[in-house]
Amino acid sequence: MRSQPHVLGIVLAGGEGKRLFPLTADRAKPAVPFGGAYRLIDFVLSNLVNAGYLRLCVLTQYKSHSLDRHISQTWRLSGFAGEYITPVPAQQRLGPRWYTGSADAIMQSLNLIYDEDPDYIVVFGADHVYRMDPEQMVSHHIDSGAGVTVAGIRVPRSEASAFGCIDSDESGRITQFLEKPAHPPGTPDDPNMTFASMGNYVFTTKVLVDSIRADAENSDSDHDMGGDIIPALVEAGEAGVYDFADNQVPGATDRDHGYWRDVGTIDAFYDAHMDLVSVHPVFNLYNKHWPIRGAAENLPPAKFAQGGLAQECIVGSGSILSAATVRNSVLSSNVVVDDGATVEGSVLMPGVRIGRGAVVRRAILDKNVVVGEGEIIGVDLDRDRERFAVSNGGVVTVGKGVWV
């Protein structure tokens, strides 16, 4: 029986998330609220903790206050057994400069690796929505003998040009790592599908440290994990692919097995929320066998008064619907929808208030937005464009704290 390997988790959470503006105007992308009760960072941390990995460093940088606070308050572990989940802001250990890329973030944090001295390091992104058992990927990595293993999700070749793509042979060795190619490669067993990189990696420690140090000396590098480190290891013959379809999460349904969403744009963020609200959701937040953990707020239950109605909705704690109609929507905590108001196909973040008789359709309202009596959002997009951000898909986004 193989002894348990010593694994350190590094979560790359410094993303600025420009394509999610205005949701990222005041916070880092991994801190953006999601699903009525979570932040994006909670999905990767839940996956790692559920797998038993309890020594995790979260590298932060861009507007990280709310993210650092959330990690410190929500993800506290007992230190008696050496367990920790700690936010690590840019330390400027190598001089007065910030991180210049994801690989540079690890370069500036090598002291964390030296202190922990792990056998293997999982390096995961912080801004995707999915369930995964990372321990299965680590076991695959150890058995394969690769220096780095890249998680790949199967996507149709016709859609793969939007991703970093993996070309591999039948043994799982990666032969090419291509950034958004015009002609994506097929998988060894299906020419109509392509392995897209999920941005999740497992490294043998020496391989990661050596490659990070070599990259730091390369003045032509962008110091990016996917753009520089992985291609260099592919060229050296040290990279393998892990098929995400092989990952078996306890409690997963046939419908949500293999679910993974990059929510880097407003339209993708909106669509991922709509995946949550059907009777048989595409992604099931209610899997008790592999829970997604978030901040536990001390709030009263949601209240429906004077005939308030919610259909195909998620409604957060402390929310009140008073003689209002809400359909196909996600409401976070402390949302109030007043008499006669209608909310359809929308995402309302904590503290939002919808006034009497107001109408909100296909919209994302950030925290503490107040919509006045009789106001209309999401019906006249030309008018909305003069006031708010409107995505290519017609989703209206109202920034944090705006009074309409």
UniProtKB/Swiss-Prot annotation:
Record carries keyword ATP-binding: yes
Main enzyme class: transferase
InterPro entries, alphabetized: ADP-Glc_PPase, ADP_Glu_pyroP_CS, GlgC_bac, GlmU/GlgC-like_hexapep, NTP_transferase_dom, Nucleotide-diphossugar_trans, Trimer_LpxA-like_sf
A molecular function GO annotation: glucose-1-phosphate adenylyltransferase activity
Pfam family, one: Hexapep_GlmU
PROSITE patterns registered for this protein in UniProt: ADP_GLC_PYROPHOSPH_1, ADP_GLC_PYROPHOSPH_2, ADP_GLC_PYROPHOSPH_3
Enzyme Commission number(s) from the entry: 2.7.7.27
Reactions catalysed: alpha-D-glucose 1-phosphate + ATP + H(+) = ADP-alpha-D-glucose + diphosphate
GO biological process annotation, one example: glycogen biosynthetic process
The protein's annotated pathway: Glycan biosynthesis; glycogen biosynthesis
Residues annotated as binding alpha-D-glucose 1-phosphate: 99, 164, 179-180, 197
ATP-binding as UniProt keyword: yes
Keywords tagged on the record: ATP-binding, Carbohydrate metabolism, Glycogen biosynthesis, Glycogen metabolism, Nucleotide-binding, Nucleotidyltransferase, Transferase
Function: Involved in the biosynthesis of ADP-glucose, a building block required for the elongation reactions to produce glycogen. Catalyzes the reaction between ATP and alpha-D-glucose 1-phosphate (G1P) to produce pyrophosphate and ADP-Glc.
Family: Belongs to the bacterial/plant glucose-1-phosphate adenylyltransferase family.
Subunit and interaction comment: Homotetramer.
Full protein name: Glucose-1-phosphate adenylyltransferase
Native source species: Nocardia farcinica (strain IFM 10152)
